[in-house]
Amino acid sequence: APRPAPTRSRPPRMVAYRVPQPTKEEWIRSHGGLYGSRVLYLGQEIDDEEMNRVIAELLFLDAEEVANQYLYINSPGGSVIAGLALYDVMQHVGSPVITANIGMAASMASFILGAGVRGKRVALPNSRVMIHQPMGGSEGQAEDVRVEAEQIMKIKNTLVTMYAQMTGQTRERVIQDLGRDNYMSAQAALE
């Protein structure tokens, strides 16, 4: 019996993003087959480069088709400003972004977890969430330290308001919960 003709698989989709050297474009593979399933992965510290990667993928998938996107998270957190950029894009795109905690969603990563579609956020049974208030590390002249402290307080106020909206908790409860490193199981985070 004759053999069937071999089928060709589609090449993996690639997303362009600019790397730190401003004259070089680099193509990246989006975590294997996950990309074709509209799955994105945040699995490291939140910094400008990582957020630019996730944002580029989110925007590309949204431009390709308005449909559910899934953001899996296992991150220690990181830059508040970079995280807020991802939050803004998640709210901007037409595609619903469903978030899932698959390990640790700490600090800014917990905020991104909460930014997913309400009622569709997922935390695996052994995952953990940690929230706390934003931190700064200013050094130098007293005026510089004062200016940074004011900015941190403004960011804290913004985060408190947004956490309250995302979770349905009161501002007072959110302020209390952010007062220290607050580790929670998946079940405790749900409550």
Language model regions located:
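Terminal-region recognition feature
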Residues: 2-191
